[in-house]
């Protein structure tokens, strides 16, 4: 069966958009990883868990590789279709399903932009702590797949520390649920944490329940110059030894400051 017929057969079987135009294939061939390009056979854009399952079931039956992708902001090549096949774009699955104000939880689809989630829960007086530098464009699904962190990791940890449970689809199309809607859950294997950071190699995440905190009532930003990197590191150690845990810490060298000043 030729490539065009394969893609048409996939679209019919999965019931979701399957893109084969040059622009879509070119966009799906790269992420923010430098100098790497891998062109897929096609781009499937499911809108539900059922459609993700149908895509994977079809691909499994035909022996065609599938590479899931979010916003393609990653720097480690996790979204690149290195073996060709189907690029599975989850960008259409971008719903915030439910914000649970009582239990401080939120249930989301993988295509939700992190900043959109942060703003939505903040409107309810809640706080999602994971704050990667690309929060304005990266997705929750990508964060989970890569176990993303950010400057706030110093106090709040990384993505794995905020995932309560997952809905995911295995390579053969089987839909599974992991974990529970509780902070303490010691029942069975910890499949949730097995999937976090797996870069889409074990399953495709289609829904996640995340922990939230009450929104901080006060914040302060401090910019402090130091004569040397050693002095800055010593100051950080002294801050922690004094019992103060900042929500975020960032270090900027003099050269970076000068470049920034020259272009702002």
Model region roles, listed by residue range:
Residues 95-99, 105-252:
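FAD-binding subdomain of flavoenzyme oxidoreductases
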Residues 71:
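N-terminal cofactor/phosphate-binding cores enriched in small/glycine residues
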Residues 1-57, 74-104, 133, 256-261:
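N-terminal flexible segment immediately upstream of the FAD-binding catalytic core
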Residues 64, 84-86, 245:
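The start of beta-strands in P-loop NTPase/AAA+ ATPase cores
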């Amino acid at each position: 069966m030729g490539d065009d017929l394969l893609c048409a057969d996939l679209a019919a079987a999965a019931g979701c958009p399957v893109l084969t135009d040059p622009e879509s294939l070119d966009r799906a061939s790269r992420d923010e990883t430098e100098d790497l390009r891998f062109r897929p056979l096609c781009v499937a854009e499911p809108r539900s868990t059922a459609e993700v399952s149908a895509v994977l079931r079809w691909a499994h039956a035909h022996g065609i590789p599938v590479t899931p992708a979010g916003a393609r902001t990653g720097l480690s090549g996790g979204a690149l279709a290195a073996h060709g096949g189907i690029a599975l774009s989850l960008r259409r699955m971008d719903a915030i399903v439910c914000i649970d104000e009582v239990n401080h939880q939120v249930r989301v689809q993988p295509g939700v932009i992190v900043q959109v989630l942060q703003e939505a829960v903040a409107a309810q007086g809640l706080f999602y702590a994971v704050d990667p530098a690309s929060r304005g464009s990266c997705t929750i699904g990508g964060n989970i797949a890569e176990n993303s962190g950010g400057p706030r990791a110093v106090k709040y940890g990384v993505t794995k520390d905020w995932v309560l449970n997952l809905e995911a689809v295995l390579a053969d199309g089987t839909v599974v649920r992991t974990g529970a809607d509780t902070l303490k859950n010691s029942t069975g294997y910890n499949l949730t944490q097995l999937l976090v950071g797996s870069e889409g190699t074990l399953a495709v995440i289609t829904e996640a329940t995340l922990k939230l905190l009450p929104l901080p009532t006060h914040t302060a930003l401090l910019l402090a110059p130091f004569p040397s990197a050693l002095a800055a590191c010593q100051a950080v150690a002294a801050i922690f030894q004094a019992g103060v845990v900042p929500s975020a810490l960032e270090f900027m060298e003099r050269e970076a400051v000068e470049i920034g000043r020259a272009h702002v």
